[in-house]
């Protein structure tokens, strides 16, 4: 019997989840919930139905796991605890500093209703977090490094678009090659924010806008650009569409450590991702964890979980015997 999936929110992430379900034979998309008028939302799965978010509660016995595809700033802090009262839920909450409080609010709602809520699923947080944990457990004497890119940062692109005089923009985060090599060589460097990444902005300005002012506003923006070496390119709308319409991303999680009685041996653990589509990859991780949420809840588990709490075997459609035979 298929695991019945619902999607809440049908943007880049929601569409990615729909595509990922197509590649997982044990999952079935039943419903997409939207804040828009349902008749205006066209989905790809002919056997699924689009509903208003207001109708979600009526579907609580027809959906095994709801994958919540909202934004971390304002949507998920409200939506995940709210829907954990009705469903097993998965989200991709990625505001690292606020994960503990988000966990607590989802945990209270999910425990009360007897559901599972797996939060902060994706690649960072998510797959990168897991690799940091494994590497820390194995190389206890060492240092962690995370590099992001080269890729489009959605949050930084949005921040540039909000600047006066900007019509559209894309921002790329780029690892500094020399810093990456020093880490890979086991040199254990102490790196500042500026030494690890650069930022590159491609900006379409409004007609007659003050380009020097826009460039200054970008480069001095606190929390986003002021701590980085930032390059700004002004280009046409056509160039932006032609050359920068994709959403690629990726990065590296590296731990460099020492073993031996006198710390005489060096080791480097590296995990890397190179993604054509950031939302489609994130969606694929969400779908694997939806399977895990269903299985864990069937066993009687409830409450909030993170990727740290989910045993790897729960993620895979194959059973234990098959995994031991083919993957171990």
Predicted segments with their positions:
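C-terminal substrate-binding/catalytic lobe of Rossmann-fold NAD(P)-dependent oxidoreductases
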Residues: 4, 15-16, 23-54, 152-290
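Glycine-rich Rossmann-fold phosphate-binding loop(s) that bind the pyrophosphate
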Residues: 10-11
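Rossmann-fold NAD(P) dinucleotide-binding segment
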Residues: 56-65, 73-92
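General beta-strand structural signal in soluble alpha/beta enzymes
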Residues: 91-92, 117-121, 147, 170-171
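Rossmann-fold NAD(P)-binding glycine/threonine-rich loop
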Residues: 93-117
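Oxidoreductase and adenylate-handling cofactor-binding alpha/beta cores
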Residues: 127-143, 158-168, 292
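NAD(P)-dependent Rossmann-like dehydrogenase/reductase catalytic/cofactor-binding core
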Residues: 267-328
């Amino acid at each position: 019997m298929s695991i019945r999936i619902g999607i809440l929110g049908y943007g880049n992430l929601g569409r990615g989840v729909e595509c990922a379900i197509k590649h997982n034979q044990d999952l079935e998309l039943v419903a997409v919930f939207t804040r828009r008028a349902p008749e205006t939302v066209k989905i790809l799965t002919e056997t699924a139905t689009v509903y208003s978010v207001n109708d979600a509660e009526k579907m609580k016995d027809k959906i095994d796991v709801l994958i919540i595809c909202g934004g971390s700033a304002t949507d998920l802090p409200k939506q995940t605890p709210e829907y954990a009262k009705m469903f097993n839920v998965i989200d991709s909450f990625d505001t690292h500093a606020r994960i503990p409080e988000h966990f607590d609010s989802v945990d209270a709602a999910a425990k009360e209703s007897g559901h599972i809520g797996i939060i902060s699923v994706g690649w960072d947080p998510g797959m990168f977090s897991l690799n940091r944990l494994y590497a820390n457990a194995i190389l206890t004497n060492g240092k962690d490094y995370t590099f992001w890119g080269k890729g489009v940062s959605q949050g930084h692109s949005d921040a540039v678009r909000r600047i006066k005089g900007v019509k559209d923009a894309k921002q790329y985060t780029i690892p500094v090659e020399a810093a990456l090599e020093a880490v890979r060589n086991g040199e254990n460097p102490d790196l500042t924010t500026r030494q690890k990444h650069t930022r590159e902005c491609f900006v379409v300005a409004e007609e007659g806008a003050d380009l020097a002012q826009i460039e200054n506003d970008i480069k001095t923006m606190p929390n986003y650009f002021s701590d980085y070496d930032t390059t700004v390119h002004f280009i046409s709308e056509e160039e932006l569409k032609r050359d920068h319409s994709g959403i690629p991303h990726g990065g590296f999680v590296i731990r460099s450590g020492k073993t031996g009685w006198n710390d005489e041996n060096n080791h480097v653990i590296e995990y890397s991702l190179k993604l054509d589509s950031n939302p489609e990859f994130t969606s694929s991780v969400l779908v694997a964890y939806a399977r895990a949420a269903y299985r864990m809840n069937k066993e009687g588990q409830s409450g909030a979980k993170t990727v740290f709490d989910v045993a790897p075997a729960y993620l895979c459609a194959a059973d234990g015997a098959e995994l031991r035979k083919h993957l171990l």
